[in-house]
Amino acid sequence: MSADEAAQAHENREAADGIRGTAHGTAPVPLSVLDLVTVGAGRTATDALRTSVELSRRTEARGFHRYWVAEHHSMPGVASSSPAVILAHLAAHTERIRLGSGGVMLPNHAPLVIAEQFGTLEALAPHRIDLGLGRAPGTDGATAAALRRSDTLNEGADDFPEQLAELIRFLDDDFPDGHPYRRIHAIPGPVQGSAPGGVQSAHRPPVWLLGSSGFSAQLAGMLGLPFAFAHHFSAQNTVPALDLYRQTFRPSPVLAEPYALIGVSALATDEEREARRQTRAMALNMLRLRMGRPGLFPDPAEAEQAELGAMEEEFIASWSANVVHGTPDEVRSGLNDLHKRTGADELMITTHAHRGEVRVRSYELIADAYELPTAG
């Protein structure tokens, strides 16, 4: 084996280690965090970002495997429009937990820009970065058009496989001779290791595909990539999508067997009634978003007093049923049942609440329910 081949094999092993986590305590699989940086009514984006810092540090101390930040735009109650910027900030406040995008919406960005951003993150936090990619816009159609500077709303989503291939080539710096991008390099990146005076190639963050249907599941399987499914807003498609991913999976240099995590909405409180109050606020927030009236995340008292029609109350009940909520024991039981039904390799918990301390407390209670160790 040549030196280059040995280096690549080492790189692949490190990538695989970053993908597969370790379960702690009594948890059946690794537990992770998905953060949308929720902004409550009467609070600011600064407040929400401070909560994200605290939450990343607390979940790191309790053995959560990774902490991902989503990309959403033009939503007053969500301050995660720029995952790379937020991740850089979190990297400065954490030491071990993996940090990643859940996800970056590839059609909204030039592949070279994403490669440069995540190469920079990898340089800031070596061997801790995940690059999760989605094909949805993460917003409404008009905002998507503004982001892409195009009147064609589907532009970018339709050629997602081609965009993905281009991004991976930038990450690996392996455009073939004769390609118009052959002399273009994502910096920081592998080319620095082969440049005069170069010491070693930069580590390439593992690429994940995100999805809520069969398209990304099949593509992830065919490419041998890890897959993250959005169970929290597409629960009816979870099992079919995971089955499709496993059926179409082809081993790759970074992943010998399929690895799938699912995102799940969960909220634990000391008392069951309070969990129901918080979950109703979560459902009301989603109802307003679906009705084209997104706003700051409502206070539970506002949600309790909201006058809704029969169809709106039906939506509230349906959405709440897909949130694993209750006392810590009830949430643990619900998460265990979800794992048994789906066979997911990892559970990524997302928790939304009006107050940041409610979110932080929920993760602490879940960690306690699973007897996760406390670092330090």
Model-derived segments and spans:
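N-terminal beta1-alpha1-beta2 module of alpha/beta enzyme domains
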Residues: M1-L99
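An alpha-helical appendage that flanks or caps ligand/catalytic pockets
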Residues: S2-E5, N12, R20-H24, L153-G189, ...
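Flexible, glycine-rich active-site loops centered on histidine and acidic residues
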Residues: P28-A45, P107-F175, F227
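Conserved, mostly hydrophobic/aromatic
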Residues: L31, T59, G63, E71, ...
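Hydrophobic faces of well-ordered beta-strands that scaffold small-molecule active sites
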Residues: L31-D35, Y67-V69, L99-S101, I129-L133, ...
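Active-site mouth loops of central-metabolism enzymes
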Residues: D35-R50, V104-L112, S201-G211, W319-P328
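Short, acidic/polar
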Residues: T46-R58, S212-Q218, E330-D337
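A conserved active-site cap/scaffold subdomain adjacent to cofactor or substrate pockets
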Residues: S213-Q236, A241-L242
